[in-house]
């Protein structure tokens, strides 16, 4: 053996199960593999006799296993080496060859001196014995002469030679000589030089046979290794092809995943840009909504003030209705007094005629004194009484005329005052009616504006919900939007509050049926705005209403275009965004123009 590393490698090659031990039948193949690693000039690790002894021992103990340490111990016992390593075996001199040469020389000398047959190697002295003979004596084994060539036929091969059948080189085996030489023939003393030549040739022949045997064995081992390596190479090639196919499939999957990742990243950037735009739009709508809320609060305050004024006017109207009743009662009394006055005048005329006739009958000469002019002065004078014969008549008539005239004056004064109050009440009712119509038109404008605002908020909410369905990352944004923005129910509640206020107005107007005959038209529904206030819709409300409707329709159209553009790339989305921004600018410009044309505070602008 060269070193411990080679021994460990060869031993592990026979340890198929990696148990740290091999079968005892693998002892000689391991020795042969180690021998192949030695140079050709190095002595063999085991002699033929030692190999034969080992083979017999293996046959007797075929079921045993041996470890590395046991392997070293057995080898030490066979070679009588006390060192722990096998590396020093190569440095020992080839004692076996020298002893064999010495024994041959000694045998030749003995034959030459005694002219008899040479002694057997078994009868030689201990000094002249070779290591194999000494080993046989020590182990009490039969000598090598008893073994023939047939005993060495079943020599174990290497595991490579056993595992794969190889084309063996039989040319050297056909000329193979027996491993153990037979007993040397006796030579005469005259053939000493010939014996030397024969021994040298025999040694050369043995070396050549050993080298040929080693070469054939190395060829067998190498062929087995080549076959095993070709088998492993084929397996590795198949595995390489499989791994190549798997790698190609994995590369294709990686490419598809990269493409999907790029698409997802692009979609994420698109959605992020859309979110930023929607966030900016929502921020602007929030600002507009806050401004509308402030304006709504101010309008609500004004509306409450107007309702208070309307209540006061309704109280005044109720009082004026009471005054009208008193006026009617006083007018009836005046009419009755006029009738009574006429009756009294007729009665006075009758009395004057009777007295005139009486005076004519009593004083026929007093025509001048009793002329009609004098009689009239006497009758209609309120300070001087008539000189009648009957004093009761002369006293009672002037008194009745004075009372009636005073009452008539008082009644005329009261009638004038009542007429003035009636005219004032009519004027107040007309102003109240005009203010109520103006407030009702403004309330209708507010209701229409808030309805359009709620509709646009609902559209924006629907767009955001649909976008959130497309991307799950928008759910938190939708929740924040729902919590921050007023819902459609709140806006509808505001509209119902406004409609309730308008209903209260109509109820207040309906109480004064005598002063406002057009309250039935104001009690109509909000769908008949054109019939209630056609001037407003013709001049102010109709452009703003058409603009808001157009705006909501274009928002729906842009949402459909956005969904269509999501499937055809980024260029369509950029064009749609630019067009949408341009139209927003145009709509805001139109709104500002409408505000400047029709007044800033007369129109309610939807967001």
Swiss-Prot record:
Query: Where does the record say this protein resides?
Result: Cytoplasm, Cytoskeleton, Microtubule organizing center, Spindle pole body
- A GO cellular component entry from the record: meiotic nuclear membrane microtubule tethering complex
Q: Which GO terms describe its biological process?
A: cell division; DNA double-strand break attachment to nuclear envelope; meiotic telomere clustering
Protein's UniProt keywords contain Oxidoreductase = no
The reply on keyword Cytoplasm is: yes
The phenotype of cells or organisms lacking this gene is:
Cells show a distorted structure of the meiotic prophase nucleus but are able to complete mitosis successfully.
Give the region (Disordered) as residue ranges.
83-135
Which InterPro entries does the record cross-reference, listed alphabetically? Answer: EF-hand-dom_pair
| Primary location class | cytoplasm
* Residue ranges with Low complexity bias: 111-132
How is this protein organized at the quaternary level?
Answer: Interacts with mcp1 and sad1.
Q: What does this protein do?
A: Has a role in karyogamy, recombination and segregation during meiosis. Although it has been shown to associate with the spindle pole body it is unlikely to be involved in its formation or maintenance.
Q: What is this protein called?
A: Karyogamy meiotic segregation protein 1
Task: Give the organism, scientific name.
Answer: Schizosaccharomyces pombe (strain 972 / ATCC 24843)
């Amino acid at each position: 053996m060269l070193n411990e590393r080679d021994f460990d490698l060869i031993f592990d090659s026979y340890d198929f199960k990696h148990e740290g031990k091999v079968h005892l039948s693998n002892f000689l193949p391991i020795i042969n593999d180690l021998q192949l690693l030695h140079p050709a000039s190095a002595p063999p690790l085991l002699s033929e006799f030692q190999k034969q002894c080992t083979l017999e021992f293996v046959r007797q103990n075929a079921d045993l296993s041996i470890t590395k340490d046991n392997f070293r111990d057995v080898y030490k016992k066979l070679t009588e080496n006390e060192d722990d390593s096998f590396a020093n075996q190569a440095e020992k001199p080839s004692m076996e060859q020298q002893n064999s040469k010495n024994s041959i020389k000694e045998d030749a000398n003995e034959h030459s001196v005694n002219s008899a047959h040479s002694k057997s190697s078994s009868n030689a002295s201990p000094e002249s014995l070779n290591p194999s003979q000494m080993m046989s004596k020590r182990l009490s084994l039969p000598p090598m002469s008893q073994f023939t060539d047939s005993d060495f036929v079943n020599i174990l091969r290497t595991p490579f030679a056993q595992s794969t059948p190889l084309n063996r080189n039989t040319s050297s085996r056909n000329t193979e000589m027996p491993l153990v030489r037979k007993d040397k023939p006796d030579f005469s003393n005259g053939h000493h030089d010939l014996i030397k030549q024969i021994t040298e040739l025999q040694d050369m022949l043995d070396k050549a046979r050993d080298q040929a045997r080693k070469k054939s064995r190395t060829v067998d081992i190498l062929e087995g290794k080549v076959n095993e390596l070709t088998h492993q190479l084929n397996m590795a090639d198949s595995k390489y092809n499989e791994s190549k196919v798997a790698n190609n499939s994995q590369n294709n999957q990686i490419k598809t995943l990269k493409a999907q990742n790029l698409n997802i990243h692009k979609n994420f950037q698109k959605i992020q840009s859309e979110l930023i735009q929607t966030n900016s739009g929502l921020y602007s709508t929030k600002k507009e909504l806050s401004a509308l809320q402030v304006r709504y609060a101010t309008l609500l305050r004004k509306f409450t003030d107007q309702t208070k004024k309307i209540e006061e006017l309704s109280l005044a109207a109720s009082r004026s209705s009471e005054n009208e009743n008193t006026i009617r009662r006083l007018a009836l009394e005046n009419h009755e007094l006029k009738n009574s006055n006429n009756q009294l005048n007729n009665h006075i005329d009758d009395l004057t005629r009777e007295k005139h006739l009486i005076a004519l009958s009593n004083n026929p000469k007093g025509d001048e004194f009793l002329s009609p002019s004098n009689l009239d002065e006497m009758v209609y004078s309120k300070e001087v009484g008539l000189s009648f014969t009957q004093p009761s008549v002369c006293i009672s008539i002037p008194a009745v005329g004075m009372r009636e005239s005073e009452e008539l004056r008082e009644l005329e004064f009261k009638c004038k005052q009542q007429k003035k109050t009636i005219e004032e009440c009519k004027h107040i009712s007309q102003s109240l009616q005009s203010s109520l119509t103006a407030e009702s038109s403004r309330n209708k404008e507010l209701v229409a504006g808030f309805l359009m605002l709620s509709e646009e908020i609902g559209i924006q909410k629907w767009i955001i919900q649909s976008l959130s369905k497309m991307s799950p990352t928008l759910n938190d944004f939708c929740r924040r939007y729902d919590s921050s923005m007023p819902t459609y129910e709140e806006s509808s509640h505001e509209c119902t509050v406004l409609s309730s206020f308008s209903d209260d107005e109509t109820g207040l107007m309906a109480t004064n049926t005598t002063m406002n005959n057009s309250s039935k038209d104001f009690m109509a529904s909000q769908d008949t705005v054109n019939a209630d206030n056609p001037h407003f819709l013709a001049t102010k409300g109709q452009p703003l209403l058409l603009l808001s409707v157009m705006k909501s329709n274009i928002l729906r159209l842009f949402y459909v275009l956005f969904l269509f553009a999501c499937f055809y790339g980024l260029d369509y989305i950029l064009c749609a965004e630019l067009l949408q921004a341009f139209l927003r600018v145009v709509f805001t410009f139109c709104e500002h123009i409408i505000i400047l044309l029709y007044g800033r505070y007369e129109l309610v602008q939807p967001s």
